Amino acid sequence: MAEIMDGIIFGGQLEDFAGSIHKEDSKNISMRRSSGGHKIATFLRQNGYEIDVVDYVHRWKIEQLKQYLKPIAKDCKFFGFGSTFFLDSPVVKELVAWLKEEYPHIPRVAGSQNDSMRSLDMDWYVYGYGENAMLELMKHFDGGPEPIHFNKVINCYVNYKSFPKEDLTVSYQETDFVNPREIMMIEFARGCKFKCKFCSFPILGVKGDYSRTAQSVYDEMSENYDKWGIEHYLVIDETFNDSSEKIEKFANAIEKLPFQPKMTAFIRGDLLASRPRDWDNLIKMGITSHFYGIESMNHKAAKSVGKGMNTGRIQDGLLEVKEYFQTNAGYYKGLISLIAGLPYETIDSLRETVRWCSEYWSDQSYHMNILMIKLLGKPSLNHNSEFDLNWKDYGYRESQFPKDDIKWDMSINPFYKFLYEYVATSGEYIMWENDYTNMYDCFKFCVEEFSQAKLKNALDPFMYDKFFIDPSVKWSDFATKTHMERRESHILEHVDGYIQSKLSFASRV
């Protein structure tokens, strides 16, 4: 670490299913580092700036943060805060207030893909993929003109776009204290070629090959393996298998690595079922853990949101994929994601879906979300889905929840109750009904019936990091174990060790 830092970026996530982000004693620290923070740091370093990233910020004590910052912060050009989701935990709010008082001359910048960043008291906000916007801000901090903005919000979907981008490399430093058992996030492309009606992702309907170069992927994975021993990745692309040509491009590069990566990714199930030519290339890459956004096995319901493959064909195709990967890859994990409440979906058709999953997919994973429709009104940076904008055109009407008689104790997952209470009290989402079902009955079904489904392996492939930090856990365990505890002690041991290593290093600067 240089003695003079140009910027310090704070980031971190909490696994917050019950409001724990606002509790001082929260222990639900995510193993995941600040994806955007490290992306920005890498890009600014490539442009000549010295940037430090402070991960797991929710776990730090305010006195530890002060101790860490005092030797290195006085000449900073900015303090940054970045998170995919909420950042306003008590320690972060206290840190922001202290920075404002202690370093009033140093601007504070928050970046995110959603409106949550504006809960923090900042001088600037960077909305969207922010590499180029941050570079413009750095020029401004060096004495140049202000970037284009509205009320100090830089909209990176309009100005200073950083998509598509040929090089999406993240490069870690010695002062990041990387553990070889971490599951790192990796990005192959930005945006999605599809336009599913429930999707509120910001960049949809892209054309052509918008992915990064194969060489940059090879170089990033080689560096992470050579320096830190990293072999495991979570692919954060909206849809990875949108193009056979793209898959082949990356498979040919990754096959040359001196190790076999192990990765999990969002995979569109209907495309995978109809393109057997992609299967071996995915195996070459090590993408043998899949998250399938099937949404519904009611053909009319799936077709209404842009996924129209015949139900029998998608079911048979998924079973063929499972058998092929288990036979030829030696490892396979597939999670089917469903949405209760789509047009034409009834409670009875949901029961049929769960019966199929119980019979044919119980050795894997499946989960069911509730359709959420935002109540539009106050201005927000959040993107809106087609359903959010035009829900009445799809047969939805506003309703009210009846008296709550849901048997909440039947579900071991607290997420449903937290979501129900949020919808009922926040005023941010519509309590909807249509001609086929209503939101309340979907909650009741998910809690009282779906939660009782025959499901041997409930491990979400995107939650592996909470188990894998335990050295005794093998990658193959995720496909075979029927239940795994969160490994909280291992997570906190890693995070607390990271904090102590950062403090020790800063004390020597």
Language-model segments: which ranges?
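Hydrophobic/aromatic residues located in beta-strands of well-ordered beta-sheets
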Residues: 7, 108, 233, 263, ...
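Radical SAM [4Fe-4S] cluster-binding motif and immediate context
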Residues: 32, 164-330, 340, 355
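Flexible glycine/acidic-rich beta-alpha junction loops that bind and position SAM and/or redox cofactors
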Residues: 15-19, 114-118, 194, 244-245, ...
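Structural recognition of alpha->loop->beta junctions
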Residues: 118-136, 279-289, 354-370
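Radical SAM enzyme core and accessory elements
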Residues: 1-9, 45-50, 62, 66-76, ...
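Acidic, low-complexity intrinsically disordered segments
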Residues: 1-221, 225-228
